[in-house]
Amino acid sequence: MELLCCEGTRHAPRAGPDPRLLGDQRVLQSLLRLEERYVPRASYFQCVQREIKPHMRKMLAYWMLEVCEEQRCEEEVFPLAMNYLDRYLSCVPTRKAQLQLLGAVCMLLASKLRETTPLTIEKLCIYTDHAVSPRQLRDWEVLVLGKLKWDLAAVIAHDFLAFILHRLSLPRDRQALVKKHAQTFLALCATDYTFAMYPPSMIATGSIGAAVQGLGACSMSGDELTELLAGITGTEVDCLRACQEQIEAALRESLREASQTSSSPAPKAPRGSSSQGPSQTSTPTDVTAIHL
């Protein structure tokens, strides 16, 4: 007798959405109460960090996003890793030479929490071109856990998407597309420090608003949609409108940078690089592929 294994997919099966859970206002209110606990209180570039600058964080964020995309991580892994990164940097002065090591550790921790099969230390070392050793990753994993007080179950913007979409009652054939576009907006927001101190619920609501309006997924006017979304998460209408405008502006800037990158000549591969290794793309795929 011969056995045939047909498990070709890397992702484990997931349970479908639970209407009772999504419709229970107590669950949403609990998330709203907890979210402030995981938001950095002040700009750490002004108060804590001396060597690290905003553009360094952005470069690191794009690298982390590329790693998560190439490894086909769950959508929540990257923004959760950025949450760990911001919380750590808001309390611990860090040298710029340690920044990639910190980013790799944050991805490792986030994947352990949100992935069925987490990223491995060996694979993360390869993505750093072996600038980071397995021993360093293990040591810093314990260090970061201690500084975060082992509080890793952070509330992030992705946690609100299903609850907001459930209350919008969009056409079934549009829900998945709106969610995908909103997830792309959330990844974009995670790369931009401007949004680091925004409540996750506001970022999620603004992302869904931008996606719905861009796709023309409902018949409501922009003001009506904004008021409805603001009522779902208890956000002030003016604040939500400003957040959505910032998200749309960030998308336009990202697309402009992507078009400039694609029109410039491709850089030569570093000496000794192999085409079999992890790809070194310079722009997140989902962001450049979106058309609103």
Swiss-Prot record:
Any matching Pfam family: Cyclin_N
Modified residues (Phosphothreonine): 283
SUPFAM superfamilies hit by this protein: Cyclin-like
Gene3D superfamilies noted in UniProt: Cyclin-like
Assigned keywords, A-Z: Cell cycle, Cell division, Cyclin, Cytoplasm, Nucleus, Phosphoprotein, Transcription, Transcription regulation, Ubl conjugation
GO BP annotation list: cell division; G1/S transition of mitotic cell cycle; negative regulation of transcription by RNA polymerase II; positive regulation of G1/S transition of mitotic cell cycle; regulation of cell population proliferation; signal transduction; T cell proliferation
Post-translational note: Phosphorylation at Thr-283 by MAP kinases is required for ubiquitination and degradation by the DCX(AMBRA1) complex. Ubiquitinated by the DCX(AMBRA1) complex during the transition from G1 to S cell phase, leading to its degradation: ubiquitination is dependent on Thr-283 phosphorylation. The DCX(AMBRA1) complex represents the major regulator of CCND3 stability during the G1/S transition. Polyubiquitinated by the SCF(FBXL2) complex, leading to proteasomal degradation.
Chain residue ranges for the region called Disordered: 254-292
Keyword presence, Phosphoprotein: yes
Gene Ontology cellular component terms for the protein in this record: cyclin D3-CDK4 complex; cyclin D3-CDK6 complex; cyclin-dependent protein kinase holoenzyme complex; cytoplasm; cytosol; microtubule organizing center; nucleoplasm; nucleus
Membrane-spanning parts: none
GO MF: cyclin-dependent protein serine/threonine kinase activator activity; cyclin-dependent protein serine/threonine kinase activity; cyclin-dependent protein serine/threonine kinase regulator activity; protein kinase binding; protein serine/threonine kinase activator activity
Cyclin N-terminal domain location: 27-152
Phosphoserine: modified positions: 264, 279
Primary site of residence: nucleus
InterPro entries xrefs: Cyclin (IPR039361), Cyclin-like_dom (IPR013763), Cyclin-like_sf (IPR036915), Cyclin_C-dom (IPR004367), Cyclin_N (IPR006671), Cyclins_cyclin-box (IPR048258)
Subcellular location: Nucleus; Cytoplasm
Similarity remark: Belongs to the cyclin family. Cyclin D subfamily.
Function: Regulatory component of the cyclin D3-CDK4 (DC) complex that phosphorylates and inhibits members of the retinoblastoma (RB) protein family including RB1 and regulates the cell-cycle during G(1)/S transition. Phosphorylation of RB1 allows dissociation of the transcription factor E2F from the RB/E2F complex and the subsequent transcription of E2F target genes which are responsible for the progression through the G(1) phase. Hypophosphorylates RB1 in early G(1) phase. Cyclin D-CDK4 complexes are major integrators of various mitogenenic and antimitogenic signals.
Summary of subunit composition and partner proteins: Interacts with the CDK4 and CDK6 protein kinases to form a serine/threonine kinase holoenzyme complex. The cyclin subunit imparts substrate specificity to the complex. Interacts with ATF5. Interacts with EIF3K. Component of the ternary complex cyclin D/CDK4/CDKN1B required for nuclear translocation and modulation of CDK4-mediated kinase activity. Can form similar complexes with either CDKN1A or CDKN2A.
Name listed for the protein in its UniProt record: G1/S-specific cyclin-D3
Record gene name: CCND3
